[in-house]
A protein has these predicted regions:
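Hydrophobic transmembrane alpha-helices of multi-pass small-molecule transport proteins
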Residues: 1, 22, 64-84, 133-134, ...
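Transmembrane alpha-helical segments that form core, pore/gating elements
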Residues: 1, 52-54, 87-140, 168
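C-terminal transmembrane-helix exit sites in multi-pass transporters
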Residues: 1-6, 31, 48-70, 190-209
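Specific transmembrane alpha-helical segments of multi-pass solute transporters/efflux pumps
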Residues: 4-45, 74, 81, 158-176
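Juxtamembrane helix-entry segments on the extracytoplasmic side of multipass membrane proteins
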Residues: 9-12, 84-104, 138-156, 203-213
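Cytoplasmic-side transmembrane-helix entry/capping segments in multi-pass membrane proteins
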Residues: 11-20, 64-75, 95, 117-127
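Hydrophobic/small/kink-forming positions within alpha-helical transmembrane segments
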Residues: 19, 23, 27, 47-54, ...
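Helix-helix packing/entry segments at the starts of transmembrane helices
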Residues: 27, 41-48, 112-130, 162-198
């Protein structure tokens, strides 16, 4: 895509910070779920990144209407119902890693709100992150069995879906408020659940429908009522 548009990856100081935050997200997310329940992990990831983005918005003196705070609370309640986290014993180290992931993703999103060239900036961030990750991959003791199919899916997921998805995210971020972006992220687990229903025939229970109403309602509230 960069070649077609005659662009090149951009490398700036912000690219290093963005890449480091991306690495924090990648490592924290990947290793946390080895010891942390899915529901708890989702709550920490999306809730934590929302806190980081809201705190950044306050620091940058972004005007936040009361309805947006109320909408966030309603959406978080919907997320809680959707993931239905159990309160079983989770590894404290795994929980800490997920907090690291939430901080990394929140910071990556905040930095993206000030980018003007989403595609080339994302490419630069990915290249720097790859340079950081490769040495870490050799340090971490882990035996991983791979095959050609898994290798292909990893390449496709990283270069196509993640690359284009993150570029789109960086394109959207400068056009909306940071707090609006943080709340909009809560649709991700909702979309994932619906995708499971469409593509792998997972069932949708009452929790999904209630969560959908709360999450979408919470996101819509500050759009229609801006006070």
């Amino acid at each position: 895509v960069l070649i077609v548009q005659k662009q090149i990856p951009r490398f700036k100081f912000n690219s290093i910070i963005s890449a480091l935050s991306l690495v924090c997200y990648l490592i924290g997310f990947s290793f946390s779920y080895l010891t942390v329940d899915t529901g708890i992990g989702a709550l920490i990831l999306f809730g934590g990144s929302m806190v980081v983005m809201f705190a950044s918005a306050l620091f940058l003196q972004e005007k936040i209407p009361l309805t947006r705070f109320i909408g966030v609370f309603i959406s978080l309640l919907g997320l809680f119902i959707l993931v239905n986290p159990g309160f079983s014993e989770n590894s404290l180290f795994g929980v800490a890693l997920m907090f690291l992931a939430s901080f990394g993703w929140g910071l990556y999103s905040v930095l993206g709100s000030r980018q003007k060239n989403p595609l080339s900036n994302t490419a630069g961030n990915f290249i720097i992150a790859l340079i950081i990750i490769i040495p870490i991959a050799f340090i971490i003791p882990d035996k991983v069995e791979t095959n050609y199919y898994g290798f292909f899916l990893a390449i496709f997921s990283g270069s196509v879906t993640s690359g284009l998805g993150y570029s789109l995210w960086y394109w959207v971020l400068p056009k909306i408020n940071i707090t609006t972006a943080s709340t909009a992220q809560l649709t991700v687990p909702l979309i994932a659940a619906f995708g499971g229903y469409l593509f792998i025939w997972e069932s949708l229970n009452w929790q999904f429908y209630i969560a959908a109403i709360l999450i979408l309602g919470g996101i819509s509230l500050p759009v229609f009522y801006k006070r």
